[in-house]
Amino acid sequence: MSESRLPHLSGTGDARMVDVSEKAVTARSATAAGRVLLSAECVAVLRDGTVPKGDALAVARIAGIQAAKKTPDLIPLCHPLFISGVDVVAELIDEGVEITATVKTTDRTGVEMEALTAVAVAGLAVIDMIKAIDRAAVISDVRVLTKSGGRRGDWSREDDS
């Protein structure tokens, strides 16, 4: 594999942290989304606000924000970034919870991993809050929806609204 295709690999195939010191500092953002699929009973409990452990959606939002800030501690080759904003939305839908996270920075590398981490950990927080009600909950479809800034410019997933 060429270095340009997988920049986290050295010429000999060893993992490395990419040197971004020569890259321009630019405004960047990324939005990711995912779902927690739940039973109808669990959705009803969430809708009624009677989850025994408390407000699952509020906990998910805070967990997602915290996760975005901790991404370089969790993903070994991610750069520590100056995150200027994180917005996590956790909405109840018929199938469970839809989670969306937008992360912004002005830095040398993008924030896709921070947005993905925010969504994944927010989903884990939902499961932690409702596991006594629905042991079969599933985190699903975690993906980047959009990214902006940087050398390659803006990108948007075509198969998502």
Report the location of each language-model feature:
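C-terminal binding/interaction regions
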Residues: 1-57, 62-77, 83-161
